[in-house]
Amino acid sequence: AKDIMVMRETDRPKLAYVLKRGEYQQRGEAVGPETPAALPAFPAGAPRNRLGLARWLTAPDHPLLARVTVNRFWQSLFGRGLVKTSEDFGTQGEQPEYPELLDWLAGEFVRSGWDVKALHRTIVRSGTYRQRSFSSAEQMADDPENVLLARGPRHRWPAEVIRDQALAVSGLLVEKMGGAPVNGYDAPESFKQIGRAHV
């Protein structure tokens, strides 16, 4: 017989305590599961557990999750987010450069049922994304960081993409999914002598 691993809520969850000076033997007052005071409270009737947390995070009126997610995907496609400080959406982070666009994309993302492919499709089919990345010296001087989104995204490729491109150009890229790993440098052509050193 096979066992299926599942999680189940306990009848009496363990209490958590404020620990005085961080020492586990010096318990302070008991604390219950709740959201931070600066954020909206759990929905009425939501359980105070992981399910309640998930429902709270994905509620359509939650101010952060959809915006942070959209900003991260925008950053991956454009090289920088609509909010430049993507790791800090709080009061110490920067304000969005296009708040209406961020709100609209976040709303569309929630309305699509949190469909990441639909979000990507919306962004990459936009006129902003499909612009040429070339610009004149004058445009570069006026807007070096492309804050105005007047040209297409241009950012560095990650190492994996560079490797795949090098393998594709050399004819060594295997497009089949799965299988044994391929070391592109083991090909016999890789070891041809291309010059002779004078000793």
Where are these regions (language model features)?
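Primarily short, surface-exposed interaction patches in extracytoplasmic proteins
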Residues: 1-198
